[in-house]
C-alpha cells in the first residue's frame, strides 16, 4: 500500500471515529485522562497577580469618534481565592506600565501612549466594612440648634413651649405697683366698722 493511500485511509478513519463513538463511551483501558493534582489547583487559585483583559473605552467631547486598536489590553491584576469569606484579594504592590495604542480618528491615525496600572504583589486582607467607608451618623456633630424643653410639657403641634414664652417686664412708675386684690378691697377697715356700729345704735334707739 502506497504512503498516499495510507494517509487517505487514516484521514477517513479519523473523521468517522467521532461520529461512531457514543457520547457515554468510557475511556479505553490504558488511556486515562490527565488529572490536575490538588496542589496545582490550589496554587492556581490563590491570591496572586494574574493576566486579565481590560477594555479601553475613550469618549471625546467632540463629534469626531476615536477608535482604539486594540480595543482591549492584557495587564497583571490581583485575583484569586482567599481562605476565608471575610478576606479579599487586594494589591500590595503596583506600578505603571505604558503601552502604545493606535488611535484612529478618521481620516487619519497615529500612535499614542496610554498608562495603565499593573499589580506586582497581592495579599488577602479583611474586607472593609460599611462603617469604615461611610461616616457614622452618631459620631457626626449636628449643628442644628435643638429646641428647648421643659419637664412635664407636652406641647401640641404648633404650640409654643413655656421656655419660649416671654413675659414683659413692667416699667418703673405708679403703674408698677400691684393693684389691690379683690379680697382686700371687700374687707372693711377700722373706721368703716365704727361708723357701721354707730348707725346700728341710732337705728335701735329710734325704734
Swiss-Prot record:
Gene3D superfamilies: Cystine-knot cytokines. GO terms for molecular function: chemoattractant activity; growth factor activity; heparin binding; identical protein binding; vascular endothelial growth factor receptor 1 binding; vascular endothelial growth factor receptor binding. Expressed in all tissues except liver. Highest levels found in heart, skeletal muscle and pancreas. Residues 122-207 are annotated as: Disordered. It holds the Pfam family PDGF. SMART domains: PDGF (SM00141). Residues 174-207 have a biased composition (Low complexity). It is found in: Secreted. Its main location: secreted. One of its GO terms (cellular component) is platelet alpha granule lumen. Residues 1-21 form the signal peptide. Keywords: Disulfide bond, Glycoprotein, Growth factor, Heparin-binding, Mitogen, Secreted, Signal. VEGF-B186 is O-glycosylated. GO terms for biological process: cardiac muscle contraction; coronary vasculature development; induction of positive chemotaxis; negative regulation of apoptotic process; negative regulation of gene expression; negative regulation of neuron apoptotic process; positive regulation of cell division; positive regulation of cell population proliferation. InterPro entries: Cystine-knot_cytokine (IPR029034), PD_growth_factor_CS (IPR023581), PDGF/VEGF_dom (IPR000072), PDGF/VEGF_growth_factor (IPR050507). Belongs to the PDGF/VEGF growth factor family. Homodimer; disulfide-linked. Can also form heterodimer with VEGF. Growth factor for endothelial cells. VEGF-B167 binds heparin and neuropilin-1 whereas the binding to neuropilin-1 of VEGF-B186 is regulated by proteolysis. This is Vascular endothelial growth factor B. It comes from Homo sapiens (Human).
Amino acid at each position: 500500500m502506497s504512503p498516499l493511500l495510507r494517509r487517505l485511509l487514516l484521514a477517513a478513519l479519523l473523521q468517522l471515529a467521532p461520529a461512531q463513538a457514543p457520547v457515554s463511551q468510557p475511556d479505553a483501558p490504558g488511556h486515562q485522562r490527565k488529572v490536575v493534582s490538588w496542589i496545582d489547583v490550589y496554587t492556581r487559585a490563590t491570591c496572586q497577580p494574574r493576566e486579565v483583559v481590560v477594555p479601553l473605552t475613550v469618549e471625546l467631547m467632540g463629534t469626531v469618534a476615536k477608535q482604539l486598536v486594540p480595543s482591549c489590553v492584557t495587564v497583571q491584576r490581583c485575583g484569586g481565592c482567599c481562605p476565608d469569606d471575610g478576606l479579599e484579594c487586594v494589591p500590595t504592590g503596583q506600578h505603571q506600565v505604558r503601552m502604545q495604542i493606535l488611535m484612529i480618528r478618521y481620516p487619519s491615525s497615529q500612535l499614542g501612549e496610554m498608562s495603565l496600572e499593573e499589580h506586582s504583589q497581592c495579599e488577602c486582607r479583611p474586607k472593609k466594612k460599611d462603617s469604615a467607608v461611610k461616616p457614622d451618623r452618631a459620631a457626626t456633630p449636628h449643628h442644628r440648634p435643638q429646641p428647648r424643653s421643659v419637664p412635664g410639657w407636652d406641647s401640641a403641634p404648633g404650640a409654643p413651649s413655656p421656655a419660649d414664652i416671654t413675659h414683659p417686664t413692667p416699667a418703673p412708675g405708679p403703674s408698677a405697683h400691684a393693684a389691690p386684690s379683690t379680697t382686700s378691697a371687700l374687707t372693711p377697715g377700722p373706721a368703716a366698722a365704727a361708723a357701721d356700729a354707730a348707725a346700728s345704735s341710732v337705728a335701735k334707739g329710734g325704734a
